[in-house]
Amino acid sequence: PLKNVTVDVYDRMLVYPGGIPFGVKLHTQGVLVVGIAPGDSQSPAYNAGIRVKDIITAISGKPVNSIEDVTRIVESSGGKPLDFTVTRGDSEYIFKVTPGWDKNENKYKAGIWIRDSTAGIGTITYIVPETLQFGGLGHGICDVDTGDLMPLLTGSVSDVTISGITRGRIGLPGELKGYFGAEKIGSLVANTHVGVYGVLKSMPQNIISEPIPIALRHEVREGDAVLYTTVDGNTVGQYSVKISNINRNDGDTKSFIVTITDPRLLELTGGIVQGMSGSPIIQDGKLIGAVTHVMINDPTKGYGIFIETMLANCP
């Protein structure tokens, strides 16, 4: 019975398709270890057992969420051991780190490189009319060095104006270039492996469609569809694409293949480029999903995610 309930909810659901670029600033919960100081012997944290990809959540019982938090505690330690609370996968560990004296900089250090935030551009997939909740990107925001999903503490959403394009070539994905608007237009509430989710303060002016139904995965078919995306300023364009290789059992970010067939888009971008992730795909008047990845060896092709998967993971 549970399955039917889910289907009924989605059957009646109407959403605005997006295609609108947005800027994300994400601050992590805890700080992410992205590197070890050169020469492992000089890294007290490494010697204590801390590794790249670990997330440091507290030091000697004090929560840490920024590089400044960690630096302040380590530098004022006087070289006494500190208890680093670390999340690794699903487990939590405590490592006793004794900061070392750096004679070049005259201060105590733990010997690790850490990161506490990131920023980037993506595309909004859908907006729920009643609540202004949105989903976008169709994949998670991951750390550039470790490839791991970044744990979200807080995040803000800005509008973005697309100011240029680096065209995609075989072996070298292109990208949309843009600048963030001064105003925050919303906030992020979740960063998941199938997309980012948040709430907007108001309905964007550049929506180009009334709310439309969503397609369940069994309704998605091979053949023609339309991609909504923004490649110039903040005007959403509609471009023809083809859907193929549908894997209905896939609950992840590569559920079908999207091929760009529109000569205008191919001319402008060479195909799918970074920044387009989350661009909604409409087929038979329904929102079927979003573009998630470009194929490195053929930028005219990429992968898509079912809208059903994105909605199922919405917090």
Say what each PLM segment does.
Residues 3, 20-22, 27-32, 52, ...:
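Envelope-exposed proteins and targeting segments
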Residues 100-270, 274, 284, 292, ...:
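Serine endopeptidase catalytic core focused on the charge-relay Asp
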Residues 56-57, 70, 82, 103, ...:
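Generic structural signal for buried aliphatic residues
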Residues 2-10, 71-111:
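PDZ-domain C-terminal substructure recognizer with occasional recognition of PDZ-binding tails
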Residues 45-68, 281-284, 288-289, 293:
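Conserved PDZ fold ligand-binding element
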Residues 87, 91-92, 133, 282, ...:
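Hydrophobic transmembrane alpha-helices and their immediate loop junctions
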Residues 58-91, 298-300, 304-309:
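PDZ domains, with a preference for the canonical peptide-binding region formed by the helix
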Residues 8, 12-40, 46-47, 92-100, ...:
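Signal peptide-directed extracytoplasmic domains
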